[in-house]
């Protein structure tokens, strides 16, 4: 669901409401790929629980998301990873650079607005640490960034009773880092060990 000047709006408000109604009838959380525009407004009106991407979210929309206590998931690499631009034609690259400035402003505004968030990779798997670094660079506190890739992500997925933090009774899944990401978020890229279900696998 988008409806920016560049991306089509695929679902009507009535269709979104039907999705939400069916999901709630079986206690399923709803989420939408949503960059901004009318699509974002319609997702909120329909009752979608989580908005993915929000690249073009406006300040009035930030205020509404905050008031209605919805989740957002930031996936900044598609907009901020300059290495991806080399895959584009020179014409498209120029347009993407212009969009980058707009997206940075919108995401920074959402972060400043205090929205509760998770952080994801969208289609760029294996890059979660870099996504976290981008969000830190856009103004989020490192503690909030860490929550975005751990407990908040688990809450969004409805899995926070079994994972997302280190606590008795939860899955023993965690990474050991060389440094402290609260001091330097880049420490997320310096993994020295990985424990999965209580077993050292790296």
Regions found by a protein language model. Name each.
Residues 20, 40, 62, 107, ...:
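Short glycine-/small-residue-rich flexible loop motifs, especially phosphate/cofactor-binding loops
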């Amino acid at each position: 669901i988008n409806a920016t000047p560049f991306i089509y709006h695929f679902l009507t408000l009535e269709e979104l409401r039907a999705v939400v109604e069916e999901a709630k009838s079986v206690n399923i959380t709803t989420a939408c790929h949503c960059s901004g525009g009318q699509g974002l407004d319609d997702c909120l009106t329909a009752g979608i629980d989580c908005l993915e991407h929000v690249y073009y979210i406006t300040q009035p929309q930030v205020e509404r998301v905050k008031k209605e206590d919805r989740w957002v998931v930031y996936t900044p690499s598609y907009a901020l990873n300059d290495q991806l631009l080399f895959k584009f034609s020179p014409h498209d690259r120029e347009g993407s650079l212009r969009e980058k400035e707009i997206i940075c402003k919108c995401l920074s505004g959402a972060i400043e607005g205090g929205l509760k968030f998770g952080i994801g990779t969208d289609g760029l798997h294996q890059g979660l640490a870099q996504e976290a670094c981008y969000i830190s660079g856009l103004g989020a506190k490192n503690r909030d960034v860490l929550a975005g890739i751990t407990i908040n992500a688990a809450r969004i997925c409805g899995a926070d009773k079994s994972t997302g933090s280190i606590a008795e009774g939860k899955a023993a899944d965690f990474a050991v880092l060389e440094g402290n990401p609260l001091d330097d978020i880049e420490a997320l890229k310096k993994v020295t060990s990985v424990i999965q279900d209580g077993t050292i696998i790296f």
